[in-house]
From Swiss-Prot:
Substrate binds at residues 82, 88, 120, 151. InterPro entries: L-lactate/malate_DH (IPR001557), Lactate/malate_DH_C (IPR022383), Lactate/malate_DH_N (IPR001236), Lactate_DH/Glyco_Ohase_4_C (IPR015955), Malate_DH_type3 (IPR011275), NAD(P)-bd_dom_sf (IPR036291). Its EC number is 1.1.1.37. It comes from Chloroflexus aggregans (strain MD-66 / DSM 9485). The active site is at 175 (proton acceptor). Disulfide bonds: none annotated. NAD(+) binds at residues 9-14, 33, 95, 118-120. It comes from the Bacteria. This is Malate dehydrogenase. Catalyzes the reversible oxidation of malate to oxaloacetate.
Amino acid sequence: MRKKISIIGAGFVGSTTAHWLAAKELGDIVLLDIVEGIPQGKALDLYEASPIEDFDVRVIGTNDYADTANSDVIVVTSGAPRKPGMSREDLIKVNADITRDCISKAAPLSPNAVIIMVNNPLDAMTYLAAEVSGFPKERVMGQAGVLDAARYRTFIAMEAGVSVEDVQAMLMGGHGDEMVPLPRFSTISGIPVSHFIAPDRLAQIIERTRKGGGEIVNLLKTGSAYYAPAAATAQMVEAVLKDKKRVVPVAAYLTGQYGLHDMYFGVPVVLGAGGVEKIIELPLNEEEMALLNASAKAVRATLDTLKSL
């Protein structure tokens, strides 16, 4: 039986995720959007690349949630970007309405699926998706940490002048300014990153990582990143469908780990067929724990805003 992946939202991130997934031959792909013609056109275009790129998966575009039934993985990328003059609360409300609508329609049709959220504000939207779906918390997660860690690894490799393949890096916390990169748990082929990069330069790399999404928005002027976010999402889908037991940072539901309760928050996990199969608790020092708590406070504030709407 072939695996089935449904992607809700056929914008740049959604359609590029479909591209990465097709190239990896992870399963048949359903690309869904509310705008007629967009998912159908993008899906057909991608499907027509299959004889050239030699991937043997079916790709369909649709506006009908019935086509997503019995999915193994549901990826939600749909959401509104923040517009000029829009308050943080306005953005939360708009995207909460979108998330509620998507999940309430998709989840009942695929009761055994793993849900991966890719819309913002991520931790709050993932919490909402878990609530609306009623799924076990380990089968609902958010993608941010894999992307943030990839940016962190890229900048470390650039600075050290080494292959990015040899850079391992860990970070935690919320997405964006609230993220907590962990240099103490970052290595180049097992060698501490501090052996290659001076503390002041590493501090600059950490700051650039925190602002990574904004840097691309400022360069593009009219959009945001999509290649790397889509690749990060595809890596998570692959870990689930192939039961790879990957150790990656994702937004997972916490029940006391790191002293945090009843919230989705970026932590290292073991990711496999069951979704978040284990949450890894790192022995953080006082400084790292202070940064983590500050991040958690910001994420909690967003969650409180969501709950008050």
